[in-house]
Structure formats: structure tokens, C-alpha cells
Amino acid sequence: DGMDFARRIKELGYKVSINPINIMGYSDKDLLWIFEQVNAIHPWQFSIVDTFGSMRRRDLERIVSMADHNLAPDIRLALHLHENMALSFCLAQEFLDKHLRRDLAVDGSLMGMGRIPGNLPIELIADYMNETLGCHYDIDEMMDAIQDHIAPLKGETAWGYTPAYFLSARYNLHRDYAEHYLDKGDLTNRDINHILAGFDRSKATAYDKDYADRLYREYQNRAVDDTAA
């Protein structure tokens, strides 16, 4: 499994970061087990990965507190965020403001570039770190890179906050479900909200097209029945 692979890679002399996907899907008991396994491997870094962009401030507080109290103090703690709820910059600030007694890292991308809805805009958190933590990131260089290389790409392939991806995050579902229903072309955001609200939790993490289509047909049939009534 992933832990065994990380252990073997570390034994080869590489710096290892362990990044469990969808950390919001784990119970506190699961997280404690993960931290125990991570301590046994003792990697360079452990990353809190908000895979589905569903993390809120209270979730960050809980998970960071558990990680800080249970991970070995020399393991760096990192944060990887998505922009489903337009909270990535807020959460990154909260994380850095904790001033934990361990090394911290936050990753992002210029202009938040990434598969829609995108990631934390790295220029925002770099500027925040300059202002509050005494860092010296060159914002001019980032602005030049955005103008010359990233902005033209956004004209070809859009990313950023959209309501449908907020809804998938709201229910902590795989983002492909939102994309699937958007591609139908005949659903409003209200429709998508109602369909996603009815998802079985066992289908949340791994995208299941057949299941998504079944719920779509059931929803459409109910809509027809309501109209007839």
C-alpha cells in the first residue's frame, strides 16, 4: 500500500512527503492511525490534502491540531488546497498564522492555475507571507510570469470558482460528478444541488459514471411526474 511504498522510497535515500488524498474523508480515529504509521516511517513532510475542496475553517483547525499533537515534531506539515469554495487563501492564512513549533509549507500555483476550479493562487499567499512573516518573495516576477505565460492559458482553458464545483465540495464528493452534470446541459445549479444531496456516501470518493447517470434519470423522472401533477 501507500505507506509501504513510502517506506521503501525513504530507504533508498529520497526525501519523502506523505500526502493522503481526501483527508476530509477520514474520521478522527482514522487520522490517529495514519499519524502513527507516518511516525513509524518518519518522512520529511506530511501534507494535509483537501482533495475535494470541502474544507472549512473548523475542519482545518481540527486536523491541524491533531497533526501537530500526534506527528513527530521534526516532520514538516504542509497544506494543499483547492478553490471549490473560494476559501483557499483564507485557509492558507489561518494555517500560517498558527505559528506551530515545526516547519510549515503551503503550495499553490500562479493565478491558481489547475484543473477547474483551481488551486491556491501562490502570488496571494506569497504577498501575505511578505507582509506578515518577513519573507521576501518577488511579486514583480510573479506578475510578469502570470502576464506572459499563465493569463494566455486561462483564455484557452478556464479555471476558478464556479457554483457546480462548490456543490460537489459541499457534499465532499468527487469533482467529476459536478463536471458530469454540467456536461448534461439541461440541469440548473439548483438541479445539481438536489441530485448531489441524494448521493450515497459509498459513492463519494471514486467517480462512478453509471451511478451518476442513474441518479440523473431518477431526478428527471421525478421532475416529469411533478410537472404532470
Q: What residue spans do the PLM features occupy?
A:
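Catalytic cores and adjacent flexible loops of soluble metabolic enzymes
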Residues: D1-A229
